Amino acid sequence: MYKVVFIGTVASSFYSFRADLIYALLKQGHEVYAFTSEYTAEDLKKIEHLGAIPVTYTLNRGGLNPLEDIVATYQLSKKIKEINPNLVFSYFSKPIIFGTLAAKLAKVPRVIGLLEGLGYTFTEQPERLSKKIQLIKKIQVFLYTLALPQLDQLIFLNPDDPHDLLDQYSIKVKKVEVLGGIGLNLNHYKFSTNFSSNISFIFIARLLAEKGIHDYIK
């Protein structure tokens, strides 16, 4: 039996997007811990219902205070060390950066990261990036150059992302895998027949200019 630690931020991501992976690990007899920094009591109950063990920790997802992040990383490493896992799996930008560093401090044997996308700082904007966003991007790239080489494996979903991040900024990673789209569990998100005869158009994306919201409105 292995102990596997998942490090995310928003608690709902565990039961919305990681449930099948957690079920598969539990079925194989492994113990799964779900680290979340943004949660409610109801969220923690839903994680328990999956069969995973919820663990709360502190990490400001949008914070830019380096001292705060250093303290959070140290505290996170202590929590990881108490569990003594065989593997740490982080997803989302900040958990991949600080979760990886914390896992290495805790001497975890294997550390894996999943980047589902590079985020708005790496997205071309109709207008140039603001100076603040440019600064955030520089900080993010610097932190990636520190953290990503520590990973045993880095998984991407978008086949363009390895070039846009690793090649563009000369970041060395031990092993890279492009998984592609992870899809939906159709037993959970079941097909429903069209209940309206009217033709309608739906915009499924974040309300950002680079996602095409202006084109959709026009």
Question: Which residues are covered by each model-predicted region?
Answer:
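A short, histidine- and acid-enriched strand-loop-helix "catalytic/donor-clamping" loop
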Residues: 9-14, 60-64, 105-134, 153, ...
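N-terminal strand-loop element at the rim of the active site
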Residues: 7-68
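Nucleotide-sugar-dependent glycosyltransferase donor-binding/catalytic pocket residues
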Residues: 13, 62, 93, 184, ...
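Short His-centered aromatic/hydrophobic patch
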Residues: 90-96, 115
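Nucleotide-sugar donor-binding and catalytic loop/hinge architecture
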Residues: 1, 47, 186-200
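A short, active-site helix/loop in glycosyltransferases that binds the activated sugar's phosphate group
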Residues: 141, 148-176, 183-186
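Conserved donor-binding/catalytic core segment of Leloir-type glycosyltransferases
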Residues: 181-183, 193-211, 216-217
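Membrane-proximal helix-turn-helix segments that form the acceptor-binding/catalytic region
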Residues: 23-28, 74-77, 134-154
